[in-house]
Amino acid sequence: MMVKMRIICFLLILPFLSCSASEEEPFVNKQDDPVDGIRIAWDYSSMQCLAPIGGYPRIKKLIDNSLIVVYDASGNGVLRRSFDGGTSWSEPVNVFKQHTYTNKDGLSTTVNIANSELIQLQNGDLVAACNFRPSKDEIAPFAIVIRRSKDLGVTWSEEQILYEGGPRFTDGCWEPSFLQLPNGDLQVYFANESPYRNSDEQEISVLTSHDNGMIWDKDIKTVSFRAGHRDGMPVAIISGNDILVSIEDNKVGQFKPYIVRNSISDNWKIPVSEDSPLRESALLKPLAENIYAGAPYLLRIPTGEILMSYQTTGQRSSNWELSTMEVSIGDKSGRNFSKATRPFDVPFDKEAKWNSLSLLDNKTVAAVASTNAFTSSVGVWMIKGHILSDVQARKNAIILDGDLSQNEWGDDFPLFVGSKGKSNIQSGICYDENNMYISVAAHPNGDLINQLSVYLDPENNCVTMPDKGIYRIDCKNNGNITLNEGDKGGWKMIDSKQITAKVKTGAQQQYTLEISIPFSVLHKIDRKPMRINLMLETSMYKESLTNSTPESTGSWMKVVF
């Protein structure tokens, strides 16, 4: 009887089970926020060691197009120079030397050099700065010191002490950085504990010279101060009619990057306090209180956007000593910093700190850091970064032969992938009435590139997953291609006969590739903006365009026709 009842119950519910099994959940794609504007793509193959032992590096490009790097090493402030864009460097020269200081009571201490800095003035002179740091308390004052060179670093003036803090570590002065105003006034910004000898507080101070640093105002101005806290590590730039100073601010929890600002005309008449609207958290997405992000550095690029580097424990351990360099991109007003990248791949038990940024040319920046990521010692390492922006496609018909001739493609290949390893690709886009053309120059550099993939969102749909109307073209290094169309979050191979590709091989497994894609295949009628992503695949890793993901088309780069 029981068996019969169970059979009857099963037969009654069977239609409902069958119905449920046959019904599929409807696929719902979501809109994705578009990622527009500039990005920084770090070039792993450009990485080099500038000093096997050293720290706190700063690179400056001079008016003669040479480069100078200053850094701290073995208690000295050191300088090296490059005349070939950073490929080779001169022998190191000590601009500031470690020395012994003896006070009036006959007590002596070693004074180390720290926080080396450099600026080239509007008149061509070089001015270097550093922080005098005595190794013993109560003997010598901490100090901000400069030297001048009128012959591009061949000879240097005597040391000039601009400011002296207390003779102890808790009342010191630190981290000088320069700014020259449009009217020629030269400023030195620094972190200053000396006014707060009965507390652990610290402010940002500034000194000004009206004659290119020969004579300095006696009055020191307070730039910013948060009562009960420690504003530190100032770096100043000009943006429009404003002075922007990046600082580290420990308002709550760990240090975070902030921007304090003043108009050039106001020029710090009133200090920026903790509740001033002229003090702003720099990052678009705030970090958790327990994440450290200190030692910020600013760089304005030719298109007006402002880059900021800092050292952070984000997605690492809580030990700030093992933080790594990160670079974010702000808008032209120095706000909303986002699109973070990490120039160096630093293991969790290593560090990349006390970093800075420099502009090498209109399309290239340099990041330098003190790191032991690649050796057992902390040294000075540099890497170059390509400034990528929304792609302006070049209108030109291409003869498909795999040869990326200047007549057809020009000199500009605005897309770059190559941050993870020595292999990299550069790419450009052309078009005519009927076709879109994509060029790729592949540089395996020892890591064979097995496949290149081109991702296209022809209608700029900006969705979170691939679906109908989203395409992926896979290209082998022999020119064989397959075409895939998005399908409910995945990919489905479709006919690729109308797409053609030509490969031209070179030495050491390098090759160039041209692809012709009819607009009709992409069902693209107009020439409104679209989006593109690239991916290279080696036997060890895959890598796509910086700040992009293969699935999310809004993260791909915009192409304008």
Predicted segments with their positions:
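Asp-box/BNR beta-propeller blade signature and adjacent active/binding-site loops
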Residues: F27-S389
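Acidic/polar low-complexity flexible segments
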Residues: D390-D403, Y455-N484, F519-F561
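Glycine-aromatic-enriched beta-strand/loop faces of beta-sandwich-type recognition domains
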Residues: D467-Q510
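Solvent-exposed strand-to-loop "edge" motifs in beta-rich extracellular domains
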Residues: D72, A441-N445, P518-S520
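Short, well-ordered beta-strand segments enriched in hydrophobic/aromatic residues
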Residues: G402, N435-A442, Y511-I517
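C-terminal motif of bacterial Sec signal peptides marking the signal peptidase cleavage site
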Residues: L17-S18
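Sec-dependent signal peptide recognition
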Residues: K4-L11
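Surface-exposed, glycine/proline- and aromatic-rich loop segments on solvent-exposed faces
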Residues: P414-N484, S539-M540
